């Protein structure tokens, strides 16, 4: 239900770096997991693996973000099979590219990449919305 998570949610304060940490992405992540893998963390579909169907490009992008932020943390390709680490990667991507915590943008870009089209991601977007609690 959209009543639990608005489609556009601003940060609780003006600090953009903290906005995704303050916003509750759990309903979105859980719905994406159900759509992507029915919750199976071992699923493989081409180069997309794990509960959130993360690609090697996504892992590299997360590592680039971490490096740019001065972090020594780095994700491994096997981390895609770990649901909690997959969620961390999702949150990291949101904190970098979706600072306004726009749920629609998060869902569509998870499916279609940063240059998604509404038309190309509409089916996926609707499936995720139906799975949100």
Locate the predicted segments by residue.
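Hydrophobic h-region of N-terminal signal peptides that target proteins for export
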Residues: 2-11
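Catalytic glycan-binding domains that act on GlcNAc-containing polysaccharides
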Residues: 12-133
